Amino acid sequence: MVSESHHEALAAPPVTTVATVLPHNATEPASPGEGKEDAFSKLKEKFMNELHKIPLPPWALIAIAIVAVLLVLTCCFCICKKCLFKKKNKKKGKEKGGKNAINMKDVKDLGKTMKDQALKDDDAETGLTDGEEKEEPKEEEKLGKLQYSLDYDFQNNQLLVGIIQAAELPALDMGGTSDPYVKVFLLPDKKKKFETKVHRKTLNPVFNEQFTFKVPYSELGGKTLVMAVYDFDRFSKHDIIGEFKVPMNTVDFGHVTEEWRDLQSAEKEEQEKLGDICFSLRYVPTAGKLTVVILEAKNLKKMDVGGLSDPYVKIHLMQNGKRLKKKKTTIKKNTLNPYYNESFSFEVPFEQIQKVQVVVTVLDYDKIGKNDAIGKVFVGYNSTGAELRHWSDMLANPRRPIAQWHTLQVEEEVDAMLAVKK
């Protein structure tokens, strides 16, 4: 038995005992950092292997990577912006009503503030303080004074008006002076108007001019003499400095009256209506022919004692302030709505058509005295408004007559515009 066991022991292969020597820290678990590094290294190695398999040069791969990164960033930015925009819209929706109300209130408050400031400025100009009454009458502005004389010639039924001199006139020009002259006329008809000469750059002009009105003494009592001092302006409407009125029924014509009178502010008159005129314009460029047809006028100002007029029309072709040609219509007696239908032609070369002016003046014919202008209008160079439109329409439609109504203007105002050179 012993021999069998011994025999088995000898027959079995020898068992080698290997002692495994562990490192000092083998019993400690691997740290998390090392595990992550190994994983990252493996991924990197795998990625690089795959990358090398792609049949593209390195620069192309880098470019693709940059584009991909940019696309991702752009998408992120758009998403963020959309979210913020939605939030803002919601906030605006909630505050909309209140915000508008505040804005309106701000506007009203601003208007009130400006109004208050304007009132304060007015007070400062007039020298008023909070404790002073605003209702106190303002001191009347000094407009100067005028010396005149009045006499009546009973033998010839003539009223003689002398304009002697003016003094202490206000300065209306930039240089601290004025260019005064005096207008003299009788109300209510205003038909006969006289003007003195203009005295340049002075506040104390000496006129020494006399004017004669032919008025029967029996009619004189119902009239009022007006003397108005104006400041002459070459390029715009003349400014009135002041005026005064003398009712003829208050004057003693038994002797010559000579006195000084203070000028007063002129009453603001409504723009006097002078009437309207209709005429047509036709221009043929190839022939250089301008045709003006005076058709009719309406609602003309009454110029005669009987409440009518004897109107006719003058047409002037002008360039650079010079009259090149003059034409006139027939006279229509005792009417304020004359019908003419009269044609007039002027030779105007095409190169000159933009430089000329057609001046249309309606006058009242007077057998004895001077023919008075009722009103005036001009088309062409330097014209404005309806007049410029008419001229432009004519040029835009060659060979076709273009008719249009025009409102008559005061002669002096039109002359001032014609004098302006652009």
Curated annotation (Swiss-Prot):
- Asked if the Swiss-Prot or TrEMBL record annotates the protein with the keyword Transport, the reply is no
| Cofactors that this protein relies on | Ca(2+)
- Taxonomically, which superkingdom? Eukaryota
Q: Name one GO molecular function term.
A: metal ion binding
Positions of the UniProt region annotated as Disordered: 113-142
Query: Where is the segment annotated Phospholipid binding?
Result: 136-382
* GO biological process per UniProt: calcium-dependent activation of synaptic vesicle fusion; cell differentiation; positive regulation of calcium ion-dependent exocytosis of neurotransmitter; regulation of calcium ion-dependent exocytosis; regulation of synaptic vesicle exocytosis; vesicle-mediated transport
Residues bearing the modification Phosphotyrosine: 230
Residue spans making up a coiled coil are: none
Domain C2 as annotated: residue spans: 142-261, 273-406
Provide the cofactor note recorded for this chain's UniProt entry: Binds 3 Ca(2+) ions per subunit. The ions are bound to the C2 domains.
Residue numbers on the Cytoplasmic membrane side:
81-422
Gene Ontology cellular-component terms listed: axon; chromaffin granule membrane; clathrin-coated vesicle; dense core granule; exocytic vesicle; plasma membrane; synaptic vesicle membrane
Residues bound to Ca(2+) 5 are 304, 364, 366, 372
Q: Where in the cell is it found?
A: Cytoplasmic vesicle, Secretory vesicle membrane; Cytoplasmic vesicle, Secretory vesicle, Synaptic vesicle membrane; Cytoplasmic vesicle, Secretory vesicle, Chromaffin granule membrane; Cytoplasm
Q: Where is the lipid attached (S-palmitoyl cysteine)?
A: 75-76, 78, 80, 83
Sites where a glycan is attached: 25
> Bias regions of kind Acidic residues — which residues?
122-134
- Matches recorded under InterPro entries: C2_dom, C2_domain_sf, Synaptotagmin
Query: What the record says about its domains?
Result: The first C2 domain mediates Ca(2+)-dependent phospholipid binding.
Subunit-level organization: Homotetramer. Heterodimer; heterodimerizes with SYT2 in presence of calcium. Interacts with SCAMP5. Interacts with STON2. Forms a complex with SV2B, syntaxin 1 and SNAP25. Interacts with SV2A, SV2B and SV2C. Interacts with RIMS1. Interacts with PRRT2. Interacts with DNAJC5 in a phosphorylation-dependent manner. Interacts (via N-terminus) with RAB3A. Interacts with SYT12. Interacts with calmodulin. Interacts with DNM1 (via C-terminal proline-rich domain (PRD)); this interaction facilitates vesicle fission during clathrin-mediated endocytosis (CME).
**Similarity section:** Belongs to the synaptotagmin family.
Query: What's the protein called, per UniProt?
Result: Synaptotagmin-1
